[in-house]
From Swiss-Prot:
The lineage of its organism: Bacteria, Pseudomonadati, Pseudomonadota, Gammaproteobacteria, Alteromonadales. The complex is composed of six subunits: RnfA, RnfB, RnfC, RnfD, RnfE and RnfG. This is Ion-translocating oxidoreductase complex subunit A. It is found in: Cell inner membrane. It comes from the Bacteria. Keywords: Cell inner membrane, Cell membrane, Electron transport, Membrane, Translocase, Transmembrane, Transmembrane helix, Transport. The keyword Transport applies. The chain crosses the membrane at residues 5-25, 39-59, 72-92, 102-122, 134-154, 171-191. It is an enzyme of class 7 (translocase). It is a multi-pass membrane protein. It comes from Shewanella amazonensis (strain ATCC BAA-1098 / SB2B). The gene is rnfA. Part of a membrane-bound complex that couples electron transfer with translocation of ions across the membrane. PANTHER family: INTEGRAL MEMBRANE PROTEIN OF SOXR-REDUCING COMPLEX, ION-TRANSLOCATING OXIDOREDUCTASE COMPLEX SUBUNIT A. One of its GO terms (cellular component) is plasma membrane.
């Protein structure tokens, strides 16, 4: 039980996919302008990442590995991710049209979010079992969501602040992301 908790904490805080592994930077910078969009993107990404992680494990374990088709791993994982994203987009469109409009192009772009594919491939490389794959996917999603929501709140606060002209926009966003990354480095010794 403690092994699973350590995996979850390690994935969320210590090995955060955005701040440590630099995966998922496109939606991190693109959707973080408004807190409402960041929360919606976080929920959608959490759902997609967790489900894609589990389904990718199943595809690898019961389809690719037994038939020695591991060379198709990346392509099959991308297909699984695309199906999960399409399902999520239909679900969001039916349940919340305003959220669907707010997310705009970023919802279909979850398909190309390298963090989603990275989690699926790292699950295979680290030889996680089914439960570990689910926890790893969920932890990566929670870590992504945590960083995205915190960063979005900071960007909204910075938009109201008196930032010098050369630092406005992307420059102050990159400085803020760097400071967040330094703050998350404090968790490094938490999990071995």
């Amino acid at each position: 039980m403690s092994e699973y908790l350590l995996l979850l904490i390690g994935t969320v805080l210590v090995n955060n996919f955005v701040l440590v592994k630099f995966l998922g930077l496109c939606p991190f910078m693109g959707v973080s302008g408004k807190l409402e969009s960041a929360i919606g993107m976080s929920m959608a990404t959490t759902f997609v990442l967790t489900l894609a992680s589990v389904l990718s494990f199943l595809v690898n374990q019961y389809l690719l590995a037994p038939f020695d088709l591991t060379y198709l791993r990346t392509m099959s994982f991308i297909l699984v991710i695309a199906v999960v994203v399409q399902f999520t987009e239909m679900l969001v469109q039916k349940t919340s049209a305003s959220l669907h409009r707010a997310l705009g192009i970023y919802l279909p772009l979850i398909t190309t979010n390298c963090a989603v594919l990275g989690v699926a491939l790292l699950n295979v490389n680290e030889q996680h079992d089914f439960l570990e794959s689910a926890i790893y996917g969920f932890g990566a999603a929670v870590g992504f969501s945590l960083v995205l929501i915190l960063f979005s709140a900071m960007r909204e606060r910075l938009a109201a602040a008196d930032v010098p002209m050369p630092f406005r926009g992307g420059a102050i966003a990159m400085i803020t992301a760097g400071l967040m990354s330094l703050a998350f480095m404090g968790f490094t010794g938490l999990v071995k």
